[in-house]
Amino acid sequence: MTNKLRIYEFAKLLEIQNKDLMDILNKLNIEHKNHMSALEENDINLVLEYILQEKEKEKEHAEKRRERLPSHKEGRSGERQAKTFDEKKHTRHGEKASHPYDKRGEQKLQQKSQQDVRQKFDREKRERHQEAIAKESGKKLEGQERKAVVHDQKVVELFPQQEPEKRQAAKPKYEVAKEQKIEKRYQDKVAAKQKTEKATKHRKQLFNVDELTQEEVTVDREELEKIDKEVEDTLLEEEYLQEKHVRRGKKEKLKKRSKEQKEVLKLQTKTVQEEKKEEIVKIPEKITVGEFANLIGKPAAEVIKKLIMLGVMANINQEIDFDVASLIAEDYGFKVEKEIIKSEEEILLEDQEDPEETLQPRPPVVVVMGHVDHGKTSLLDAIRNTNVTEKEAGGITQHIGASVVEVNGRKITFLDTPGHEAFTAMRARGAQVTDIAVLVVAADDGVMPQTVEAINHAKAANVTIIVAINKIDKPEANPERVKQQLSEYGLIPEEWGGDTVFVNVSAKKKIGIDHLLEMILLVADLLELKANPNRPARGRVIEAKLDKGRGPVATVLVQKGTLKVGDYVVVGSTWGRVRAMIDDKGQRIKEAGPSMPVEILGLEDVPTAGDELVCVKDEKTAKTIAQIRQERLKEEKMQQSKISLDELFERIQKGQLKELRVIIKADVQGSVEALKSAIERLSNDKVTVKVIHAAVGAITESDVTLASASDAIIIGFNVRPEVGAMSLAEKEKVDIRMYRIIYDVINDIKAAMKGLLEPVYKEVIIGHAEVRQIFKSSSVGTIAGCYVLDGKITRTSNARIIRDGVVVYEGKLASLKRFKDDVREVAAGYECGMTFEKFNDIKEGDIVEAFEMQKVES
């Protein structure tokens, strides 16, 4: 099979244009139509032979031109001017001026003939002059001697006389052998310069001698011509070699320069390539092929080829992940970085750090923490001179309270976290928004489990701890034992060489309260607490509830900026416009600065405690962010419920699980979370407690409907059911329970869980009946006319049909009648009619055995 090439492919191989190749084909009479025509192997060989011949011709032509180069230096000023004048003259007359090298041989021959004529004329003139002198003096002998002298000094005397006329601007020469002259001329530039200077000096001396002596010279004509020829040959050879050396020097310089330029170009190209390699591209987690191609500046088709080579089949609109895209980008020499794409929510809520000059001192936020009944609320009561403890149900703090205390003209914000273990989550949130934690430990009880928990929360939140040893007024108080116990957890007193402040106090007798406040301010000064009040507000929700008259109410601690009435805010998954703000003393205010707790009204829904409050520019932004968050919460709930249901189903199938469903309604969000956490922790291997709904507010009809459909109980904490909800609950037989103390909730649920455990049952046979007649009914199916043999048959009892000693059915009665009336039971000796659930294959003579499952008391 012959090899064929298209014209454009052959031209590309030869590195010539298609047009030039087609011209060659025309010269060789090779048939073709256009650049897409195919060439046979013979045609290709003909073209190659033609190109080689042309190159050989060019080479021969170049050699001929090189041979015709001038034999002596073209550069004498008079000749140069004449040549330039002739060229200009020819050009003015419309003739094209030829290149200086084109007719160099002819010019040199003309110059040589002109020199010969000039030399002959000079020689004849000198001869006539010498003959005249000889006739007058008659001293021929002397002339002959002079001739011999001249012969000895022929080059020295004749050359200086002829040179000024023949070579107007040429440098003077001195007598040296031809080989020595050429060798010395090109070996050392410095030596050549020195010799030139010597020659100049020697020439001047010779001219001076001639001028002074003015001696008569007689020279033989043939000898003079011979001398002239030798001198001229020497000069021509020397000038040619010099010119050749100059040209060679220029070529070497050009080669050197081109080499340097190539090296510079290589360095520049390398630098550009390195810069290109160092070019960074940021690629997101997912990107379409088209977008990726535009990003790296490559054709999409080329990128798709690379993908295919990697085993990824994708078109221009399909997405590729970061790993695949980074492989291709690195292959092209890019440095890859992963682009972190911010969501719309993150862009809208992006927070920037405040410059140092805008920051101002702010009050410290102090949280009071400790074990239950160690006197946290009593201590806070003593500090703020209020009486909160008596108002709390059971004397236990149920939700977070916030207050501001002024000490020596400076403000301190206090948060009170509940002490019961069910409020762990609330205490953790309290620790996250505070600067200082006051750990209250009873001097008589010492360190308790929740004390350790409080220490861990404070340390995790990087909060400075001040220990308040309370109840020192009691006789059994032992502060030193408390210090010893706390030192085991890293809280070492200052007097022991540590850095933890310990203060002995008595909340009941108000001992050491002032010292505690001074220590709080001292620690706050060391922390250098600052914030920028002149910016949009940001804060945290401490507590939230649904008020019957005011709607959703949130207690917020402002952390940055200033919150004003009328501001649009986003709080968790809800939003709103601040309609009113109420401080800790119950007074309405218009603005709240950093570290100030306030109640805000105007939210669309009840937020979750711990949610961040962010002030935004307008209503549209607030709605957009809230909507995004709500959708995300829905997705998360769907995913979580799917996972939990899968796990639940697996355990139910194994027969290991029973479920108690609970609906929780409470007055504040903190109580909702605490109850939910406490109830769900009651689950064990046999019974699972599942909170199917938890919210803030009164018990509504929708809650009752949900409980009825889900077979759940409703727990109300500090709330009452609506009128319609109560009546609906009675109708649907839904269990609603009201509580004010969390202990009661836990105890009741434990009792309910015990009732759900699988009891032990036994089978009790209550009677037998015989089928004596069969009736067919289109509406109810087969009816068995029976006679009760013994015991009794009840409507709620289970039935077993025995035929020839074999059980053919076991199930429930569908109906029990005497004549046309439904009855609850039929005693022995009476006739009755019976139907069975999903069973009609009844025959005369079958025995019906009625039985019940009775619980065995443990």
Swiss-Prot record:
Residues annotated for GTP binding in this entry: 370-377, 416-420, 470-473
Region spans: G2: 395-399
Location of region: G1: 370-377
Keyword check for DNA-binding: no
Domain named tr-type G: residues: 361-530
Matching CDD domains: IF2_eIF5B, IF2_mtIF2_II, mtIF2_IVc
Segments of this protein annotated with the region G5: 506-508
Region entry G4, spans: 470-473
Annotated region (G3), positions in chain: 416-419
Pfam families the UniProt entry points to: EF-G_D2, GTP_EFTU, IF-2, IF2_N
One example GO MF annotation: translation initiation factor activity
Biological function: One of the essential components for the initiation of protein synthesis. Protects formylmethionyl-tRNA from spontaneous hydrolysis and promotes its binding to the 30S ribosomal subunits. Also involved in the hydrolysis of GTP during the formation of the 70S ribosomal complex.
Name recorded for this polypeptide: Translation initiation factor IF-2
Higher taxonomy: Bacteria, Bacillati, Bacillota, Bacillota incertae sedis, Caldicellulosiruptorales
Gene name of the record: infB
